[in-house]
Structure formats: C-alpha cells, structure tokens
C-alpha cells in the first residue's frame, strides 16, 4: 500500500486530494497548520499532522512521523493580490517563504528516502497564472513560476534515481480560500491609482463561468502519481485546460 503526503489539507485542493487518495485505498498523511480531525473521513489509513512548511523543525518532525512516503504533494500556499506598489516587502517574503521555499524545503527533506528506494513521484501544485499573466498577481505569479522552474530542473536531477517530478496547474478556483487568505496581505493598503484596474479585474472574474473544481485537481494529481507516462506539466480544470491548449 502506497503513501501520499499532502501539504495544505485544511481546505480546497489539499483536502480534496487527501480525500481522493483515501477513497482509493492509499495511506494518506494530511498536513495542515492547525490540524482538524473532522475535515476528512475517519480511517485507519489516515494521519493528520501539524505542519508549517516555513519551519524547518516542523518539517523534520513530519518527515520523521510520516515514515516512507511514495508521493509528496506540495500544495500548501498562500494568496497575494495587490499592485506591486501596495505590496509590503514582508508580505512578498511571506508569499515566497510558503509557496516557493516551503516547496523546496519539503522536497529536500523527502528526496533522500526516495533516492535510496529509487522510486517515487513528487507533485508540485502551482497555477495557470504562470501561463498567462494577470493583473495584480505579480508577486504570487513569480512565487509559482519559480516552482515550475524548480520542478523542471529537479526532474532532470532525480531521473537517474527513477524519481518523477510533475507539476499540476489549477485554474481559477473560487471555491478555495485564495481570496480569503490573500486579504491579510492586502490590508496594508491598496493603491488608489490602481482602483480602476482592480474594479475591471474583479468584474471580469465575476463574468467568467469556466473554473477549476477541487475534484479536477485531485484527478490530475492521481494521474501524476500513478501514470509514468503523464506529462511533466498538467493543467487541472476546464479553464486551465483551455488556457494551456491556447498556448
């Protein structure tokens, strides 16, 4: 029985990924900053563990507690929506610490055991904003684009050890907490000069009916984890697939 470790399982994509694999008889290590047992169906194959991907000691504790992991899924992330002028450097660093360096740190901690076994799949969840630039997402996009580049280079590095690396790119997902967890980093102030741009952007988002559902992301992660022939970059969601196809 294989084991998947998923970061950021308190809501959205992470919770659905954990549930999806649990239903398919995998062992699941679901991690989150504030563990809540009731978020996922009770199972003797499920472990819910506290994890802060920006804290080295927290990562070490989780890796030690999890045991052998076949598929780590780096899904934990925080949102950032603001004009660059309105973005405090502390907020920008916070986004990169979680979205980018957190992914690198988790991967670095798990690679040794995978290399020794000469087996495994690393799945990094990024975003289709890396395929098409959008207003007011410059810092967030940069944090996710860095993970794409990291993944592509890492795939070459780990191929001799039979470890695959895959990137799953979801589209817009209003059912997740992206907007909610972006608000604290907007609280410092949104520049008045960009108010018109923001109004137009939000209006456009409301008009878009094609979105990404958490189940579609879970399905893409499943394909990445179980199909050796899966592509290195996998859009997830109707809008994501359409965007990737448009080039």
Tell where the protein language model's regions lie, with residue ranges.
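Residue(s) in the substrate-gating loop at a strand-loop-helix junction
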Residues: 127
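A short, exposed helix-loop element centered on a Lys and neighboring polar residues
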Residues: 107-108, 152
């Amino acid at each position: 029985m294989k084991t998947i470790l998923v970061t950021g399982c308190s809501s959205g994509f992470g919770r659905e990924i954990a549930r999806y694999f649990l239903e398919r008889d995998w062992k699941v290590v679901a991690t989150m900053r504030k563990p809540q047992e009731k978020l996922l169906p009770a199972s003797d194959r499920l472990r819910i563990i506290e994890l802060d991907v920006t804290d080295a000691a927290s990562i070490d504790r989780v890796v030690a507690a999890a045991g052998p992991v076949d598929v780590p899924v780096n899904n934990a992330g925080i949102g950032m929506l603001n004009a660059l002028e309105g973005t405090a450097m502390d907020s920008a660093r916070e986004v990169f610490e979680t979205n980018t360096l957190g992914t690198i740190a988790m991967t670095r901690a798990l690679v040794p055991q995978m290399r020794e076994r000469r087996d495994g799949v690393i799945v990094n969840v990024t975003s289709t904003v890396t395929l098409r630039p959008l207003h007011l997402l410059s810092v967030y996009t940069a944090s996710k684009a860095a993970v794409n580049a990291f993944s592509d280079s890492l795939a070459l590095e780990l191929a001799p050890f039979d470890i695959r690396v895959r990137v799953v790119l979801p589209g817009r997902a209003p059912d997740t907490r992206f907007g909610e967890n972006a608000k604290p980093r907007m609280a410092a102030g949104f520049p008045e000069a960009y108010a018109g741009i923001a109004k137009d952007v939000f209006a456009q988002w409301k008009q878009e009916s094609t979105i990404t559902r958490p189940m579609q992301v879970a399905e893409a992660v499943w394909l990445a984890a179980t199909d050796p022939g899966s592509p290195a970059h996998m859009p997830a969601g109707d809008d994501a697939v359409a965007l990737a196809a448009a080039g």
